[in-house]
Amino acid sequence: MRTPASISSHPIHPMLITIPVGLLIFSLICDLIALFSAEPDVWLLVAFFTMVGGFIGALIAAIPGVIDLLSIDDAKIKKIGFTHMALNLIAVTLYAVNIWLRVEGTSTGTPLILSVVAVALLGVSGWLGAEMVHKYGVGVDTSTAK
């Protein structure tokens, strides 16, 4: 099942999403390190900038993801795709709030809680994205298989 958002038969969304997801997970790791660090401000700053980078990257990666989603005809796969997208939209919204709280100087545990919830949502969403590819062949161009 080929996708319209591709370069030389390679889907763009899976190429782009790895970096933002890695940055967002690393942001949570930095927050956790800050809890036990003698220099928590350094780790919180790294967490902030990796979160901002992950947030921007996720928005960019969403563009080819939506293009691919809209091209799916199978209702069952499309439902999985919309669930995948909804979870990602919730996670991105949590990160937007998280970034705003950090800019405003919120020092409570709320940003950490938001990060934990958002990473959990990304895990479930990633599972669904992988299911679409590995179980249903979304983005797999079988016409060029040898």
Which residues does each PLM region occupy?
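Polytopic transmembrane helical bundles with strong interfacial aromatic enrichment
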Residues: 1-146
